[in-house]
Amino acid sequence: MRGTRLALLALVLAACGELAPALRCYVCPEPTGVSDCVTIATCTTNETMCKTTLYSREIVYPFQGDSTVTKSCASKCKPSDVDGIGQTLPVSCCNTELCNVDGAPALNSLHCGALTLLPLLSLRL
């Protein structure tokens, strides 16, 4: 019985690896209008985050114009403090496929993590 559970765990982990190809993010290395940043790039294996930096925030309020952003794949990303009112260049980070279509506000959970927990719970390790 325990061997069956371990085999199931190995199968789930293998499936997660197969289902998780390289991350893809929207990229625009130069400040670009949000609606104009439509180039998609496949990230390298060590780039596990999509990063968005917001520029020209002051011209957006009161909704007179489009904000500009830079977007990229990133190996590290430190998001701005949510309460950081008045920050000059707010940064947002996310880690799912094409998640930086806008300014993604936070990290999303990994679906494979939940799949991995199910067999572990039944193993009672």
From Swiss-Prot:
It is a lipid-anchor; GPI-anchor. Residues 104-125 form a propeptide. Glycans are attached at N46. GO terms for cellular component: extracellular region; plasma membrane; side of membrane. InterPro entries: CD59_antigen_CS, Ly-6/neurotoxin-like_GPI-ap, LY6_UPA_recep-like, Snake_toxin-like_sf, Toxin/TOLIP. PROSITE patterns: LY6_UPAR. Keywords: Cell membrane, Glycoprotein, GPI-anchor, Lipoprotein, Membrane, Signal. Residues 1-22 form the signal peptide. Its main location: membrane. Gene3D superfamilies: CD59 (2.10.60.10). This is Ly6/PLAUR domain-containing protein 2. It comes from Homo sapiens (Human). It is found in: Cell membrane. It holds the Pfam family Toxin_TOLIP. It comes from the Eukaryota. SMART domains: LU. A lipid is attached at G103 (GPI-anchor amidated glycine). Residues 25-100 form the UPAR/Ly6 domain. PANTHER family: UPAR/LY6 DOMAIN-CONTAINING PROTEIN, UPAR_LY6 DOMAIN-CONTAINING PROTEIN.
